[in-house]
Amino acid sequence: MAPKIFIDGEHGTTGLQIRTRMAGRRDVELLSIPEAERRNAAMREDMLNSADIAMLCLPDDASKEAVQMVSANNNVRVIDTSTAFRVNPGWAYGFAEMDKEQAEKIASARFVSNPGCYPTGAIGLIRPLRAAGILPDGYPVTVNAVSGYSGGGKQMIAQMENPDHPDAITAPHFLYGLPLTHKHVPEMTVHGLLDRAPIFSPSVGKFAQGMIVQVPLHLDDLAEGTTMESIHAALVAHYAGQEIVTVVPLSDSKALARVNAVELEGKDTMKLFVFGTPGGSQVNLVALLDNLGKAPRGVQNMDLMLAS
């Protein structure tokens, strides 16, 4: 019998992406609530408790409510795409390439929290340097990023694409999270192995999908003897054997005149770059990915859990 999968929130941006990716699969059975019944709490609870894996594509509070509905049913495993459980020690963090052991932790977990799009890029750059002893305690990390507007969900998509929307956004690029209290900062801190919260400055561009995350560093403030080449080597070693996360060779990065935010639109992969001048005192670490990566991450984590 095929495992039963219920996507709670299948009509939202992330839920639709996951459902599209799973269309046509015969190895799983997709449970579904008709859109007209999606606010039927009794039907929703029944679907959640009938599933082998419940994939939650909901706002934080609704995800917490869904988890309560299945908390007593050990037959149901959960993948959550909200921010509600990403730093909860009782949940496996769903970034399988983050460490060598992470895929196994996901595979054996009952509860898995999908990583956010910005944190995936930031953690992907920062964690290997912390693990290698290159990035010292107390370093004032800065993370700058630009995302496609689809990351803002249906409301922002309408604001960006419909000029007649009452709150239409016409700017080609804008900053937000101006008080520096973005909800992804705790996630970056915990899973980036940082002892000090980074300054995070997110922004949105007038393109639907894609993302660039930047972490600039002063070499003189890192571990003694750190160079652009040693940082690159640490990233290469950390992701050796991985197919989803790739580290671009320094020679290829040097040949680039620009980085295109939409290059990986619709793809599951992430590219990491190290930019700078050989012998210089600064480097800029860059992660390139699709901002809607929660969808492929969710399916990847589901496959890991089903294979266990």
Swiss-Prot record:
It is found in: Cytoplasm. GO terms for molecular function: N-acetyl-gamma-glutamyl-phosphate reductase activity; NAD binding. Pathway: Amino-acid biosynthesis; L-arginine biosynthesis; N(2)-acetyl-L-ornithine from L-glutamate: step 3/4. GO terms for biological process: L-arginine biosynthetic process. It catalyses: N-acetyl-L-glutamate 5-semialdehyde + phosphate + NADP(+) = N-acetyl-L-glutamyl 5-phosphate + NADPH + H(+). The active site is at C117. It holds the Pfam family Semialdhyde_dh. Belongs to the NAGSA dehydrogenase family. Type 2 subfamily. Catalyzes the NADPH-dependent reduction of N-acetyl-5-glutamyl phosphate to yield N-acetyl-L-glutamate 5-semialdehyde. This is N-acetyl-gamma-glutamyl-phosphate reductase. The gene is argC.
